[in-house]
């Protein structure tokens, strides 16, 4: 791709992407536009501007995407009760399509003919970024330095940075032994001692939550208000999507909620161990299932449950911008029209317990479900014919001598 003139780089300001910035300038002799996304990762993003300016970058984008991230990506995903492989709440996966979208938007605004990212050739993120980019701008060029260069260790990156005058920190505060990724939905930890699947993670690894053992001895109760499948208020106070998630992270983390240690199957074929903190997302998943339990028709709920693993897989593997994900999203969103009401939760030492749910759109009828006298609301004698009709095929098979035992 020697003909690249201008490239938009997804830039964090850290060692890897700072080396990539200089490497792009030298290898491709091109202009580099930097893009730094604030997704609620809790780190200062402004230092990225100063570092990019020091490296001669003229066009610098630093975007606060927190509200868009939760409103247009996290909330739609949680309407489906999305979980990958039974446990993972897709905190990293769901952030990538938004970053890809902004990379392409900035490329269009600046006239760039290429984009670049710092994802390695071993992981899922390279796939997620690039599938999104090609879906939104089919002719875009993609530069993935980790698949091209020979700087395959941290020491080599440090040496390159020193040689080319890139500001780095060799000393100072202790660097975490883990590879971490954070946004408003979660923080993830990989590498280090976690590469041994038998070794327990260290307690001081966790950053967002207390251990369940050290959580308060007094339970915390909260009420979440839903409108069309999304949380709009906490304890009766209306909040923006990003504020909802930030507040639930704080409340959940204080009660030891949302820790996870799993081995997942990456799209590229390998298994990978990761630890995740997703306190707000853990609360949201439990609460959303609870409000759906009284507002969704049975067959709609069961169909959603059947389709959810496919929907989760599409997000995990980078197909957010695919026609099949968009089709599923329309179905999921249509199911949420009546998902309105309030869920009351008890948070205690790592546990999220639903203790109440109510809705003007509830399909729960106490007059029918009661164990007491129902006043004729339900005729129990009707069940006999229902059972016989549903047993018909099995009775026919038995009469034909089909062995079941």
From Swiss-Prot:
The record's Gene Ontology cellular component field reads: cytoplasm
Alphabetically sorted, this entry's keywords are:
Amino-acid biosynthesis, Arginine biosynthesis, ATP-binding, Cytoplasm, Ligase, Nucleotide-binding
One term of GO molecular function: ATP binding
Sites where the protein binds L-aspartate: 120, 124-125
The yes or no answer to whether the keyword Ligase is present is yes
Q: What pathway does this protein act in? A: Amino-acid biosynthesis; L-arginine biosynthesis; L-arginine from L-ornithine and carbamoyl phosphate: step 2/3
Q: Which InterPro entries match?
A: Arginosuc_syn_C, Arginosuc_syn_N, Arginosuc_synth, Arginosuc_synth_CS, Arginosuc_synth_type_1_subfam, AS_cat/multimer_dom_body, Rossmann-like_a/b/a_fold
State the Gene Ontology BP annotations: argininosuccinate metabolic process; L-arginine biosynthetic process; urea cycle
| Top-level division of the source organism's lineage | Bacteria
Root EC class: ligase
Q: Where in the cell is it found?
A: Cytoplasm
Cite the EC number: 6.3.4.5
| Residues annotated as signal peptide | none
Record-listed L-citrulline binding positions: 88, 93, 124, 128, 179, 188, 264, 276
Coarse class of the primary localization is cytoplasm
Q: What catalytic activity is recorded?
A: L-citrulline + L-aspartate + ATP = 2-(N(omega)-L-arginino)succinate + AMP + diphosphate + H(+)
- What Pfam families does this protein's entry cite? Arginosuc_syn_C, Arginosuc_synth
- Which positions bind ATP? 10-18, 37, 118
Family, similarity comment: Belongs to the argininosuccinate synthase family. Type 1 subfamily.
Subunit details for this protein? Homotetramer.
Q: What is this protein called?
A: Argininosuccinate synthase
State the organism named in the record. Answer: Pseudomonas putida (strain W619)
Taxonomic lineage is: Bacteria, Pseudomonadati, Pseudomonadota, Gammaproteobacteria, Pseudomonadales
The gene designation is argG
